[in-house]
C-alpha cells in the first residue's frame, strides 16, 4: 500500500516555504517563516553582554527561546508561565545548538544573540521551521549590526537548515504535516549545514524498529529537502554574498 499525501505532494517534495523578512519593527532580525500551514515568527535580539563563563574571553554567544501561542493548535493549550515543559526546553536547546554552528564567536565579540521562535500556527515541523527561519533572522540581524558599525566583519561562517522526514507505509517522506506526523512509524528531525554535513539528527521509531537501509533513505530524503531550503534562505537574504564568510 502506498501512502497518499493529504496535500498531494510527492514523497520528496517540500511544503511551500516562504520567508517574510523585516516582519517586526524593533528586532534587528525578524522573519515570519511559513512552511505549508506551519507559521513561526523568528526574531533575533542583541545584548552587549555575555554569560559569566564567557566574560573576558572576547567571544560571544547565541541562545534561543521557543514558545507556542495557546491557539497555535486545534485545541487551545495553556501558556507555559512558571515552568517550561520538557518538550519546550528540548526544542529551544536544539535551536540554539543548531544556530551556534553558523557563527564565529570571536568575530561576534562579547555580545549575546537571542533567537526567539514563536509558533503562531502549528501543522508539524515547528522546530525545523524555527531553525530554518531562525537562520534567516540571524543573517538579517548580522546585516544590521554591520550596517550600524557594531561589527567590523561578519561572524556568519556557516549556513544551517532543518527538515523533518518519516516512514509511512515503509517508505521515506519529506517534510511531514500533522496528519503524516501522527501516522508515521518513524520520524526524524535532521539539521544540516551548507556542505550537507550533519549538525544533529533526532529520530525514533514509534512502532517497532527501522533498518540501516531505511535510516539511509531517511537521511537521503532529508538531504534533498535541505538543499532546497538552503537555496530558499539565500534568496531571502538580500546581502547574502557579503554576509556569508564560510566555505
UniProtKB/Swiss-Prot annotation:
The keyword Transferase applies. It comes from the Bacteria. Homohexameric ring arranged as a trimer of dimers. It comes from Nostoc sp. (strain PCC 7120 / SAG 25.82 / UTEX 2576). It catalyses: tRNA(n+1) + phosphate = tRNA(n) + a ribonucleoside 5'-diphosphate. Belongs to the RNase PH family. The keyword Nucleotidyltransferase applies. HAMAP family: RNase_PH (MF_00564). Its EC number is 2.7.7.56. This is Ribonuclease PH. Phosphorolytic 3'-5' exoribonuclease that plays an important role in tRNA 3'-end maturation. Removes nucleotide residues following the 3'-CCA terminus of tRNAs; can also add nucleotides to the ends of RNA molecules by using nucleoside diphosphates as substrates, but this may not be physiologically important. Probably plays a role in initiation of 16S rRNA degradation (leading to ribosome degradation) during starvation. Phosphate binds at residues 87, 125-127.
Amino acid at each position: 500500500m502506498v501512502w497518499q499525501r493529504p496535500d498531494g505532494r510527492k514523497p520528496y517534495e517540500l511544503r511551500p516555504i516562504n520567508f517574510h523578512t523585516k516582519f517586526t519593527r524593533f528586532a534587528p532580525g525578524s522573519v515570519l517563516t511559513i512552511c505549508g500551514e506551519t507559521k513561526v515568527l523568528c526574531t533575533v535580539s542583541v545584548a552587549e553582554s555575555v554569560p559569566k563563563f564567557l566574560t573576558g574571553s572576547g567571544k560571544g554567544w547565541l541562545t534561543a527561546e521557543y514558545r507556542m501561542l495557546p491557539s497555535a493548535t486545534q485545541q487551545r493549550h495553556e501558556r507555559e508561565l512558571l515552568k517550561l515543559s520538557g518538550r519546550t526546553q528540548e526544542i529551544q536547546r536544539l535551536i540554539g545548538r543548531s544556530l551556534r554552528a553558523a557563527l564565529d564567536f570571536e568575530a561576534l565579540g562579547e555580545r549575546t544573540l537571542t533567537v526567539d521562535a514563536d509558533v503562531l500556527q502549528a501543522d508539524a515541523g515547528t522546530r525545523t521551521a524555527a531553525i530554518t527561519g531562525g537562520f534567516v533572522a540571524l543573517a538579517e540581524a548580522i546585516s544590521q549590526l554591520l550596517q550600524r558599525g557594531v561589527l567590523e566583519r561578519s561572524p556568519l561562517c556557516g549556513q544551517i537548515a532543518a527538515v523533518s522526514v518519516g516512514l509511512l507505509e515503509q517508505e521515506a517522506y519529506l517534510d511531514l504535516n500533522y496528519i503524516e506526523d501522527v501516522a508515521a512509524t518513524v520520524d526524524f528531525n535532521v539539521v544540516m549545514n551548507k556542505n550537507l554535513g550533519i549538525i544533529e539528527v533526532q529520530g525514533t521509531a514509534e512502532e517497532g524498529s527501522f533498518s540501516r537501509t531505511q535510516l539511509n533513505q531517511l537521511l537521503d530524503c532529508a538531504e534533498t529537502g535541505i538543499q532546497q531550503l538552503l537555496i530558499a534562505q539565500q534568496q531571502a537574504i538580500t546581502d547574502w554574498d557579503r554576509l556569508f564568510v564560510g566555505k
